[in-house]
């Protein structure tokens, strides 16, 4: 999990650079508000609107057993999330 905090960052948003965790969160319905490619040009950060559910989802992604219902996701939703994130990642503007 890659959550970096600085004095300028807003607690309303969750930033993560892990592509597949971001795809999981997006497929689970979290709102993607930006893809930050400026802060670190070598590594984009996906910016989500933060919610109490987000912390639970990240924990489920990282620590539950792979066949746990908490970590399960419809394959089509996950593929669509990956496609959408890749589209947004390679767009010049969000």
Q: Could you describe each region identified by the protein language model?
A:
Residues 9, 14, 57-94:
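C-terminal basic regulatory modules in eukaryotic proteins
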Residues 37-40, 89:
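Conserved phosphate/metal-binding and DNA-contacting active-site motifs used
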Residues 39-41, 49-59:
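Acidic, low-complexity, intrinsically disordered interaction modules
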Residues 31-34, 48-50, 64-66:
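Generic alpha-helical propensity signal that fires on short helical segments
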């Amino acid at each position: 999990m890659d959550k970096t905090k600085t004095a300028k960052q807003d607690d309303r948003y969750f930033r993560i650079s892990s592509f597949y965790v971001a795809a999981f969160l997006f497929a689970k319905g979290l709102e993607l508000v930006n893809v930050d490619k400026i802060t670190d040009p070598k590594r984009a950060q996906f910016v989500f609107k933060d919610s109490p559910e987000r912390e639970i989802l990240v924990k489920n992604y990282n620590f539950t057993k792979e066949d746990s219902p908490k970590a399960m996701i419809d394959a089509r939703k996950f593929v669509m999330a990956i496609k959408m994130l890749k589209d947004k990642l390679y767009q010049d503007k969000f």
